[in-house]
Protein backbone atom coordinates (compact mmCIF):
# COMPACT_ATOMS: atom_id res chain seq x y z
CA UNK A 1 0.00 0.00 0.00
CA UNK A 2 1.27 3.48 -0.81
CA UNK A 3 0.17 6.84 0.54
CA UNK A 4 1.47 9.12 -2.23
CA UNK A 5 2.67 9.17 -5.83
CA UNK A 6 6.25 9.38 -4.51
CA UNK A 7 5.75 6.15 -2.55
CA UNK A 8 4.30 4.43 -5.64
CA UNK A 9 7.38 5.54 -7.57
CA UNK A 10 9.64 4.16 -4.81
CA UNK A 11 7.89 0.78 -5.03
CA UNK A 12 8.62 0.84 -8.77
CA UNK A 13 12.31 1.41 -8.04
CA UNK A 14 12.41 -1.56 -5.66
CA UNK A 15 10.48 -3.73 -8.12
CA UNK A 16 13.06 -3.05 -10.84
CA UNK A 17 15.65 -4.97 -8.81
CA UNK A 18 13.86 -8.28 -9.45
CA UNK A 19 13.30 -7.73 -13.18
CA UNK A 20 15.23 -9.64 -15.85
CA UNK A 21 15.79 -9.25 -19.56
CA UNK A 22 12.61 -10.07 -21.51
CA UNK A 23 10.32 -9.69 -18.50
CA UNK A 24 6.83 -8.52 -19.36
CA UNK A 25 4.78 -6.77 -16.67
CA UNK A 26 1.05 -6.54 -17.29
CA UNK A 27 -0.42 -3.60 -15.33
CA UNK A 28 -4.07 -2.94 -14.60
CA UNK A 29 -5.78 -0.12 -12.77
CA UNK A 30 -8.31 2.62 -13.31
CA UNK A 31 -7.40 5.93 -14.91
CA UNK A 32 -5.25 7.84 -12.43
CA UNK A 33 -4.42 4.80 -10.32
CA UNK A 34 -0.67 5.35 -10.66
CA UNK A 35 0.47 3.01 -13.43
CA UNK A 36 2.65 5.63 -15.13
CA UNK A 37 3.98 6.81 -11.78
CA UNK A 38 5.04 3.23 -11.02
CA UNK A 39 6.72 2.95 -14.44
CA UNK A 40 8.63 6.14 -13.62
CA UNK A 41 10.15 4.43 -10.61
CA UNK A 42 11.13 1.38 -12.65
CA UNK A 43 12.67 3.65 -15.31
CA UNK A 44 14.66 5.56 -12.73
CA UNK A 45 16.07 2.36 -11.25
CA UNK A 46 16.91 0.99 -14.71
CA UNK A 47 18.65 4.28 -15.53
CA UNK A 48 17.07 4.82 -18.90
CA UNK A 49 17.06 7.97 -21.00
CA UNK A 50 14.14 10.34 -21.26
CA UNK A 51 11.22 11.48 -19.19
CA UNK A 52 8.52 8.90 -18.51
CA UNK A 53 5.02 9.87 -19.55
CA UNK A 54 2.08 7.77 -20.57
CA UNK A 55 2.27 6.75 -24.24
CA UNK A 56 -1.51 7.06 -24.54
CA UNK A 57 -1.48 8.40 -28.10
CA UNK A 58 1.76 6.88 -29.38
CA UNK A 59 1.04 3.50 -27.72
CA UNK A 60 4.74 2.84 -27.04
CA UNK A 61 7.72 4.71 -25.64
CA UNK A 62 11.06 2.95 -25.88
CA UNK A 63 13.50 4.28 -23.29
CA UNK A 64 17.06 3.41 -24.20
CA UNK A 65 19.55 2.74 -21.42
CA UNK A 66 21.66 5.70 -20.33
CA UNK A 67 24.64 3.41 -19.67
CA UNK A 68 26.23 0.45 -21.44
CA UNK A 69 25.23 -3.04 -20.33
CA UNK A 70 21.81 -1.87 -19.11
CA UNK A 71 18.40 -2.87 -20.43
CA UNK A 72 15.99 -0.71 -22.45
CA UNK A 73 12.46 -0.16 -21.17
CA UNK A 74 9.46 -0.68 -23.47
CA UNK A 75 6.52 1.23 -22.00
CA UNK A 76 3.13 0.54 -23.59
CA UNK A 77 -0.27 2.09 -22.99
CA UNK A 78 -2.72 -0.13 -24.88
CA UNK A 79 -5.94 1.54 -23.73
CA UNK A 80 -6.77 2.58 -27.31
CA UNK A 81 -6.16 -0.84 -28.87
CA UNK A 82 -9.01 -3.19 -29.75
CA UNK A 83 -7.58 -6.24 -28.03
CA UNK A 84 -4.88 -8.84 -28.49
CA UNK A 85 -5.33 -9.07 -32.26
CA UNK A 86 -4.74 -5.33 -32.62
CA UNK A 87 -1.59 -5.64 -30.47
CA UNK A 88 -0.28 -8.38 -32.78
CA UNK A 89 -1.32 -6.49 -35.93
CA UNK A 90 0.91 -3.58 -34.84
CA UNK A 91 3.79 -6.03 -34.28
CA UNK A 92 3.98 -5.15 -30.61
CA UNK A 93 3.97 -8.77 -29.49
CA UNK A 94 7.45 -9.16 -31.00
CA UNK A 95 8.84 -6.44 -28.74
CA UNK A 96 8.06 -8.51 -25.66
CA UNK A 97 10.49 -11.16 -26.92
CA UNK A 98 13.41 -8.76 -27.31
CA UNK A 99 15.99 -8.03 -24.64
CA UNK A 100 14.69 -5.34 -22.36
CA UNK A 101 11.92 -4.89 -19.84
CA UNK A 102 8.35 -4.41 -21.09
CA UNK A 103 5.67 -2.74 -18.96
CA UNK A 104 2.15 -2.61 -20.39
CA UNK A 105 -0.49 -0.27 -18.99
CA UNK A 106 -4.04 -1.64 -19.44
CA UNK A 107 -2.38 -4.98 -20.16
CA UNK A 108 -5.53 -6.98 -19.52
CA UNK A 109 -6.77 -5.70 -22.91
CA UNK A 110 -4.01 -7.61 -24.75
CA UNK A 111 -3.43 -10.55 -22.41
CA UNK A 112 -4.06 -13.10 -25.15
CA UNK A 113 -1.06 -11.83 -27.14
CA UNK A 114 1.39 -12.08 -24.25
CA UNK A 115 3.52 -14.96 -23.03
CA UNK A 116 2.21 -17.03 -20.13
CA UNK A 117 5.00 -16.03 -17.78
CA UNK A 118 4.13 -12.35 -17.35
CA UNK A 119 4.30 -10.61 -13.99
CA UNK A 120 0.98 -9.01 -13.13
CA UNK A 121 0.42 -5.80 -11.17
CA UNK A 122 -3.01 -4.52 -10.20
CA UNK A 123 -3.19 -1.00 -8.75
CA UNK A 124 -6.43 -0.02 -7.04
CA UNK A 125 -7.57 3.02 -5.11
CA UNK A 126 -7.39 2.82 -1.33
CA UNK A 127 -9.58 4.43 1.28
CA UNK A 128 -8.36 8.00 0.74
CA UNK A 129 -7.48 10.07 -2.33
CA UNK A 130 -3.74 9.31 -2.40
CA UNK A 131 -3.78 5.75 -1.08
CA UNK A 132 -3.08 2.95 -3.57
CA UNK A 133 -3.07 -0.81 -3.12
CA UNK A 134 -0.54 -2.64 -5.30
CA UNK A 135 -0.95 -6.38 -5.82
CA UNK A 136 1.78 -8.33 -7.57
CA UNK A 137 1.44 -11.80 -9.04
CA UNK A 138 4.63 -13.57 -10.09
CA UNK A 139 4.31 -16.50 -12.52
CA UNK A 140 5.16 -20.09 -11.75
CA UNK A 141 8.92 -20.45 -11.57
CA UNK A 142 9.43 -16.87 -10.40
CA UNK A 143 8.19 -17.34 -6.83
CA UNK A 144 11.70 -16.70 -5.50
CA UNK A 145 11.69 -13.25 -7.15
CA UNK A 146 8.29 -12.56 -5.63
CA UNK A 147 9.66 -13.53 -2.22
CA UNK A 148 12.77 -11.37 -2.69
CA UNK A 149 10.55 -8.43 -3.66
CA UNK A 150 8.36 -8.96 -0.58
CA UNK A 151 11.47 -8.96 1.59
CA UNK A 152 12.67 -5.75 -0.06
CA UNK A 153 9.32 -4.12 0.67
CA UNK A 154 9.53 -5.26 4.28
CA UNK A 155 13.04 -3.83 4.58
CA UNK A 156 14.55 -7.23 5.33
CA UNK A 157 17.11 -7.04 2.50
CA UNK A 158 18.78 -4.27 0.54
Residue ranges and their predicted role:
Residues 1-14:
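N-terminal pre-Walker A segment at the start of P-loop NTPase domains
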Residues 16-22:
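Phosphate-binding P-loop
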Residues 25-27:
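Hydrophobic anchor at the beta1->P-loop junction of P-loop NTPases
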Residues 30:
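P-loop (Walker A) phosphate-binding loop of NTP-binding proteins
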Residues 35:
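Conserved lysine of the Walker
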Residues 52, 56, 62-106:
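Conserved nucleotide-sensing/catalytic segment adjacent to the nucleotide-binding pocket
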Residues 85-87, 93-158:
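Short phosphate-coordinating micro-motif centered on Lys-Gly-acidic
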Amino acid sequence: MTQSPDETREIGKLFASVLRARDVVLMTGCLGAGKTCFVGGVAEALRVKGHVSSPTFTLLHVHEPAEENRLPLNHFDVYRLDGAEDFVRHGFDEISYQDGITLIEWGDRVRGALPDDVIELAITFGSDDDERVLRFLFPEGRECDGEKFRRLLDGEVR
